[in-house]
Amino acid sequence: MRLVVCLVYLVSFALVCQGQGFKGGYTGSYSRAPPYGSRGPISTHPISRPATGCTSCHTITFDKAACCRLFGRCCSALKG
């Protein structure tokens, strides 16, 4: 049962991720709210992670990096 749930989750993530690659417009990174009780300034810069086969993605989130590894291309927005 857990295997089925896991597979359904992975397939739905892949479909959503694949759909993002063909949509027009770049939505950019999402800023996160600072945790309670934090001390000092918190950086809101997007996480920079190069993914294999995805050299056009310079600053992407963890989800988009996972999508790049899965499909071998940038999933945020295709330019041109």
From Swiss-Prot:
Strongly expressed in hemocytes, and to a lesser extent in heart, muscle, gills, intestine and eyestalk. Lowest expression in hepatopancreas. The N-terminus forms pyrrolidone carboxylic acid. One of its GO terms (biological process) is defense response to fungus. Disulfide bonds join 54-67, 57-74, 68-75. GO terms for molecular function: chitin binding. It comes from the Eukaryota. Induction: Up-regulated in response to V.parahaemolyticys challenge. Highest expression at 6 hours postinjection of the bacterium, then gradually down-regulated upto 48 hours postinjection. Residues 1-19 form the signal peptide. The modification Pyrrolidone carboxylic acid is found at residue 20. It is found in: Cytoplasmic granule. It holds the Pfam family Penaeidin. Keywords: Antibiotic, Antimicrobial, Chitin-binding, Disulfide bond, Fungicide, Pyrrolidone carboxylic acid, Signal. GO terms for cellular component: cytoplasm. Belongs to the penaeidin family. Antibacterial and antifungal activity. Presents chitin-binding activity. This is Penaeidin-3. The gene is PEN-3.
